[in-house]
Amino acid sequence: MTPNEFFSIKYHILAKAELKAYIDKLADYLSQQSYLYHTLDKPIISDSDYDKLFRLLQDLVNDNPQFKPINSVLDRVGGEVLAGFETIKHKKKMTSLANVFSLEELRDFYDKIEYDIELECEPKMDGLAISIFYKNGKFDYAVTRGDGIQGEKVSENVKTIRNVPLKLNTSNPPEELEVRGEIILDKQSFLSLNEYMQTHENKTFANPRNAAAGSIRMLDSKVVAKRPLKLYSYGIGYFSKDFVYPETQFELMQLLQSFGFTISDNMFLAKNFSEVEEYHHKMSHQRADLAYDIDGLVFKVNNIKLQDTIGYTARGPKWAIAYKFPAEEVESEVLNVEFQVGRTGAITPVARLKPVAVGGVIVSNATLHNINEIKRKDIRVGDRVIVRRAGDVIPEVVKSLPQYRKSDAQMVEMPTNCPVCDSKIENVNDQAIYRCTGGWHCQAQTTERLKHFVSRKAMDIDKLGAKLIEQLVAANLIKYPADIYKLNFEQLTGLERMAAKSSQNVLDSITKSKEPSLARFIFAIGIKDIGEVSSDALANHFGSLESFRDAKFEELIEINDIGEIMANNIVSFWHDSLNIKIVEEFLAIGIKIQNPVKVEHAYNESFTGKTVVITGSFENYGRTELTQLLKSIGAKVTSSVSKKTDMVICGDNAGSKLTKAQELGVEVILEDNLKDLL
């Protein structure tokens, strides 16, 4: 049918069954036109006709909601605002590719396969990895990568992406099919979005990848629907037995395209390594001119049977490799050096730069790490410098170019007083890190401490974000953790951009956090160098806050994961009268800390009572899953290897922990032997 034929039908006089058939036909027609426009870039009707037909479908469904088609173009406009995302397990683990950083390493990968092979070559999109599940050809749900074992269900947001098929374009779909791809925002759309964000929300995204990832994790799919996200498919994950798998990777990509998915138009089939080199050379030179950001290239063995023969490691397939482009370096000028204050008072110098594009991002700030680095690199205000940025790494100043130095270039000196609160800055034990001594009296430290206090692994007050903390501190509404629990509705609604619903959500989130575990509370109060694992060890050892407060240095250093520096920091924390006052005030307002419950563990000869460290990645276990399993049989799982460690459980790609275990003579257990011991 044509648009005019749809318009000519007198749908208002149709019988119910005929009207439903008309609505279904119109929805299918619009889905096909959307596919032609967004995926193939070959529209056959005008934008005006599409908009009119879309509006007609909306009106018909609004008047006849019982006839709303499942997985139609109407789902692309977004729906209700969600309270949060459900976490679900992947049917097939979402692994990662191993990386190489030079043509020599790429050649090694090619030679190790020991076969005369073809490689399917494609750009490595710099976006958000996603899995989309289809049942009998219809969109079922979508999940982010997460930790590879489980991810967040973001179906409503992914449905709004115009080139994501809501129905597979095939008359014989498999019962189940999981399609994997990368959600991106092209360069021009990113610039347009940032212009809008700057004008309407006074903030911008750092790069297209962050914009895509941030958009998919929004709770309001109607906002996501307005953002021009795009999906590029690169393969499949889980599939049912009735799926006929093609013989080659290249044919698989063609099949996905026939199903309605967008694939890269820069794919290439290399018949030998010379053609791989040619592809690498071509894409390296074309990278800057592509419509979207790429951070490398992906090479996959083309023959599917050969892929199965070559196999997998726990981390990912051995038949594919990711070539990562080298870090991009450009010249800029140091306009000024400012000093930032962190949660523990650490003073970090930051270079304010003449804005320059590095790795697809406009960079105007770069870390200088510490004053010793500044002196070592001889960086001065006014210098021309080399700035480097790779992936999501914070931009850094690599070196100065003294040959271009002006006579008025100024040396950088560490201030003697805090730039925020004017307290003394001290350098303890002649270390590289200088610290503000203001503590809770320093607004910068207060703000960062409160951000840490409400964070997910601490008190988990998820609706109280970093920007809102800054607003509350600036408005003198909070200064100490207990102040958070004294906030009221009127105070919150009086802040900029805080409507009634948002304010109530914050208050509900605060109330929900009033019964933290002892481990969470210890982590939340922010004792220097005490992280999540150490907090857990302290909570399990002492059993209550009262016992922890009375801890002696000698007892602390006997605990796994607690060294002398950490023990000193704990003792110093409880010797500070302000810290004690803050904790007591916190308890006085009715916070109920949940002490750990002593659990009788199942006895296991190999692990009960043993101190265990886990390192590397595992084929049959997630890290969290393995940790919980070991704890359930009485093992103490710690994060670092020491003389107190009884054994190290080692997966693929183990690093320094394995080396240290071997140096100390600690028993090493490989995954192959682990199952028998468990």
Swiss-Prot record:
Keywords: DNA damage, DNA repair, DNA replication, Ligase, Magnesium, Manganese, Metal-binding, NAD, Zinc
Cofactors named for this entry: Mg(2+); Mn(2+)
Gene Ontology MF terms: DNA binding; DNA ligase (NAD+) activity; metal ion binding
InterPro entries: BRCT_dom, BRCT_dom_sf, DisA/LigA_HHH, DNA_ligase, DNA_ligase_CS, DNAligase_adenylation, DNAligase_N, Hlx-hairpin-Hlx_DNA-bd_motif
Span of domain BRCT: 602-678
Sites where the protein binds Zn(2+): 418, 421, 436, 442
A GO cellular-component term linked to this record: cytosol
Function description: DNA ligase that catalyzes the formation of phosphodiester linkages between 5'-phosphoryl and 3'-hydroxyl groups in double-stranded DNA using NAD as a coenzyme and as the energy source for the reaction. It is essential for DNA replication and repair of damaged DNA.
Protein name: DNA ligase
Organism: Francisella tularensis subsp. tularensis (strain SCHU S4 / Schu 4)
